């Protein structure tokens, strides 16, 4: 009747992969969280479910398309494999871009503020990522470089990969833990009324996730590349830059220095390559933290606004 394996469970002969179960669980928890928050954002009670039904299919298609585009060599000889999602192959940034487009279209059709809808979606998205990342654990993917020090060969710092019988840095766990922290911070700051304007929850999601992804992506061995550039790192820094530009525009001429916010993170990518060490150095962590501090200072209102 039931048979459990490393990455799936067989129910009456039907194989159900844990990856899909965890993605579905992340979606469900995200929808429930949105349903609890929509009233606070002055949105109709059906908004959360509407966004889930409309955005999720678009996000999945775009997440898969994004991944396939950058891994075309693996699919060009077997096009039908593009539709096989049981072994993973979904890009979070592709899903975010597709979901954002769907939210924008929905906002135009329903005549609701796009940024309010984005604020509603952001914590739910982070929660879905936090849960869904555990699908990478069962699929044994999205891990980092091999661990050479015996003292680091234990979970959650590292994970044992069956394919090469080697311990690797558990980058999926790092991202999952950080995304849970993002959810907690966004909800805490929202409750404490730290966010002042429409779109702030979404913008801070982009900053917090963007910096984490830029840092952790450097540890991974399966990054998507465009030439020599890790695509996710480039998009992460562009997202941080875009948000800092929004903060700068809000503050007028006093905020233009905010455009320099991403520079420490960029310096971390260039000057402290994780490929050489396999892990983040204290200098790299300090530079990413400095970018976060700059963004926070840029977000604070100018003295004339206080």
Task: Tell where the protein language model's regions lie, with residue ranges.
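A feature for loop-to-transmembrane-helix boundaries and adjacent hydrophobic helices
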Residues: 1-306
């Amino acid at each position: 009747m039931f048979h459990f394996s490393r990455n799936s469970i067989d129910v009456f002969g039907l194989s159900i992969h844990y990856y899909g179960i965890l993605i579905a669980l992340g979606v469900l928890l995200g929808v429930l969280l949105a349903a609890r928050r929509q009233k606070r954002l002055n949105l109709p009670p059906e908004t959360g479910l509407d966004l889930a039904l409309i955005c999720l299919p678009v996000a999945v298609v775009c997440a898969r398309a994004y991944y396939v585009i950058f891994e075309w060599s693996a699919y060009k000889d077997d096009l039908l494999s593009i539709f096989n999602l049981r072994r993973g192959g979904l890009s979070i940034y592709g899903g975010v871009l597709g979901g954002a487009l769907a939210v924008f279209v929905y906002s135009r059709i329903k005549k609701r503020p796009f940024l309010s809808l984005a604020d509603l979606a952001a914590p739910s998205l982070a929660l879905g990522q936090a849960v869904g990342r555990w699908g990478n654990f069962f699929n044994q993917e999205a891990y980092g470089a091999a661990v050479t020090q015996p003292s680091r060969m234990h979970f959650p710092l590292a994970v044992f990969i069956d394919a090469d019988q080697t311990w690797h840095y558990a980058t999926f766990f790092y991202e999952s833990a950080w995304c849970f922290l993002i959810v907690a911070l966004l909800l805490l700051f929202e409750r404490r009324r730290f966010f002042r304007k429409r779109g702030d929850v979404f913008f801070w999601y982009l900053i917090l996730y963007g910096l984490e992804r830029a840092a952790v992506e450097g540890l991974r061995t399966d990054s998507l590349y465009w030439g020599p550039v890790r695509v996710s790192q480039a998009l992460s820094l562009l997202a941080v830059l875009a948000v800092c530009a929004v903060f700068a525009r809000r503050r007028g001429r006093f905020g233009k220095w905010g455009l320099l916010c991403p520079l420490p993170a960029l310096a971390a990518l260039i000057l402290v390559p994780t490929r050489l060490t396999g892990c983040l150095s204290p200098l790299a962590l300090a530079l990413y933290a400095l970018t976060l501090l700059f963004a926070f200072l840029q977000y604070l209102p100018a003295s004339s606004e206080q």
